[in-house]
C-alpha cells in the first residue's frame, strides 16, 4: 500500500462571526492560501490530482472547484467538496490520504473553509404557488429525526449530564484553553500555522476570537444558555470564518520533490453514536482507531479534540483517560474559534507544526451523532 504524507499546511487567521472577514465568500478566503502554495511549490501544483475541501454552511455548488479556479489553478484540476458537518475538514484530509494509499493519485490539496458570516439564509418552499403566508426561515440544519435532533447546545448539555461534567469542570477547561492558546501565541508556535493576509488594506494575522487575558473568576459570571444548564458562552466556542489548506502526496514522490519532513497518515476512523450525544463521538472513534492499530492511549503523545464545548471535550478526556500533557497542548477552539468545515483540517495543521512529537491523533465530535479520528506519525 502506498503511504500518504502531509508536507505543507497553512491557514488563515480565524475571524469572528461578523468580524474582519465578514465580507469574504469561502472561495475568497481560500484564494491567498492557494496562491501561497502555487508560488512556493510550482512544480508540485502542476501535478495535483484533485482538491478536496470540507464546507458546511456555504452557498452551495462545489466550493473546492470554484476556489481553485478563482485562485488561477489549471482548468484540468478537479475539485470535490465534502460535508460531514464539523468533521468535514478532517474527512477531507482522510479522503485525500486514502486516495493516495489506494493508488488513485499522488498529489492532493485537502482542507476546509467556512464563512459563518456569509452563510445564506434558507426558507421553506411553499406547498402551493397560491400560499399567502410569509416565508418561514429554517432556524438551523436538521441532523437527525426530530425527536433525536438536539441543538448543539442541548447536545452539549446532554453530554454533560450523562458523563457528570460539572459547570466548574467546564469553566476550568475553558480557562485552560485560553491560557494555553495565549502562551503558544506568545512563543510563536501558533503563528507558524497562519498565512498573513491583507483585508481592506490591513494585515490580518491573528485569530480574532483571542482574548489577551481573562481572569479565571470571569468564567463563573456567565449565565447558562439553557435555564438550569451548565453550558455558557464562556465554555463554548465562537462561530468563525477561516480557511485551511494542506499539501498531501505519496511518500516516495515527496522525497523526489525535496520534502523531508511532515506527517505520515497511518489510519482514520469515522463512527456513529447516539445523535442526542453528538459531542461524544471522539470516544469510540479514538478507541476504534487505537484498537485497529494495536495501540493504547499511552502510546500517543498528542491528542487534538476539537473544542466545540468544554463539556464534550472533558467527557471525552475522562472516558478515554487522556492526560493533560497529551490533550490540546497548544489550546484550542474555545479560544481560537471554530470555522466548522475548516476545523478538522486546522487540527491536523496544528499537529504538523509540533515538530518534536512523533505520534498524534486529531478527532472531531460531529452533529447528528458522529465522530472521526485520524492517526499520524512524524516522517
UniProtKB/Swiss-Prot annotation:
InterPro entries hit by this protein: Thiolase, Thiolase-like, Thiolase-like_sf_Thiolase, Thiolase_C, Thiolase_CS, Thiolase_N
GO molecular function: acetyl-CoA C-acyltransferase activity
EC number assigned by the record: 2.3.1.-
Family: Belongs to the thiolase-like superfamily. Thiolase family.
Official protein name in the record: Putative acetyl-CoA C-acetyltransferase VraB
Active site: 86, 338
PANTHER family, sorted: 3-KETOACYL-COA THIOLASE, PEROXISOMAL, ACETYL-COA C-ACETYLTRANSFERASE YHFS-RELATED
Top-level taxon of origin: Bacteria
Broad class of enzyme this protein falls into: transferase
GO biological process: fatty acid beta-oxidation; phenylacetate catabolic process
NCBIfam families, sorted: AcCoA-C-Actrans (TIGR01930)
Gene Ontology CC terms: cytoplasm
PROSITE patterns reported for this sequence: THIOLASE_2 (PS00737)
Key words of the record: Acyltransferase, Transferase
Amino acid at each position: 500500500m502506498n503511504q500518504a504524507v502531509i508536507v505543507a499546511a497553512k491557514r488563515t487567521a480565524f475571524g469572528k462571526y461578523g468580524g474582519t472577514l465578514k465580507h469574504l465568500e469561502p472561495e475568497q478566503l481560500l484564494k491567498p492560501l492557494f496562491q501561497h502554495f502555487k508560488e512556493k511549490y510550482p512544480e508540485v501544483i502542476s501535478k495535483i490530482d484533485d482538491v478536496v475541501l470540507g464546507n458546511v454552511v456555504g452557498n452551495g455548488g462545489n466550493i473546492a472547484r470554484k476556489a481553485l479556479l478563482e485562485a488561477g489553478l489549471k482548468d484540468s484540476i478537479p475539485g470535490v467538496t465534502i460535508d460531514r458537518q464539523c468533521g468535514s475538514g478532517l474527512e477531507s484530509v482522510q479522503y485525500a490520504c486514502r486516495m493516495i494509499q489506494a493508488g488513485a493519485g499522488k498529489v492532493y490539496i485537502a482542507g476546509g473553509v467556512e464563512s459563518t458570516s456569509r452563510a445564506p439564509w434558507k426558507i421553506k418552499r411553499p406547498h402551493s404557488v397560491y400560499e399567502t403566508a410569509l416565508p418561514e426561515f429554517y432556524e438551523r440544519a436538521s441532523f437527525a429525526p426530530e425527536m433525536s435532533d438536539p441543538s448543539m447546545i442541548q447536545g452539549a448539555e446532554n453530554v454533560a449530564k450523562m458523563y457528570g461534567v460539572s459547570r466548574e469542570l467546564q469553566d476550568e477547561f475553558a480557562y485552560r484553553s485560553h491560557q494555553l492558546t495565549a502562551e503558544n501565541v506568545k512563543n510563536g508556535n501558533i503563528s507558524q500555522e497562519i498565512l498573513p493576509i491583507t483585508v481592506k488594506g490591513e494585515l490580518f494575522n491573528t485569530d480574532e476570537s483571542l482574548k489577551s487575558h481573562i481572569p479565571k473568576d470571569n468564567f463563573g459570571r456567565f449565565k447558562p444558555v439553557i435555564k438550569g444548564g451548565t453550558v455558557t458562552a464562556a465554555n463554548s466556542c465562537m462561530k468563525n470564518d477561516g480557511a485551511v489548506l494542506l499539501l498531501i502526496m505519496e511518500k516516495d514522490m515527496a522525497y523526489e520533490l525535496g520534502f523531508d519532513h511532515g506527517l505520515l497518515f497511518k489510519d482514520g476512523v469515522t463512527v456513529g453514536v447516539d445523535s442526542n450525544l453528538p459531542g461524544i463521538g471522539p470516544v469510540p472513534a479514538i478507541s476504534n482507531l487505537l484498537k485497529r492499530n494495536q495501540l493504547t492511549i499511552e502510546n500517543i503523545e498528542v491528542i487534538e479534540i476539537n473544542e466545540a464545548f468544554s463539556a464534550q471535550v472533558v467527557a471525552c478526556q475522562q472516558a478515554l483517560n487522556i492526560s493533560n500533557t497529551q490533550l490540546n497542548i497548544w489550546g484550542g477552539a474555545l479560544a481560537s474559534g471554530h470555522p466548522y468545515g475548516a476545523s478538522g483540517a486546522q487540527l491536523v495543521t496544528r499537529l504538523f507544526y509540533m515538530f518534536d512529537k512523533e505520534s498524534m491523533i486529531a478527532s472531531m465530535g460531529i452533529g447528528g451523532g458522529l465522530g472521526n479520528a485520524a492517526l499520524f506519525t512524524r516522517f
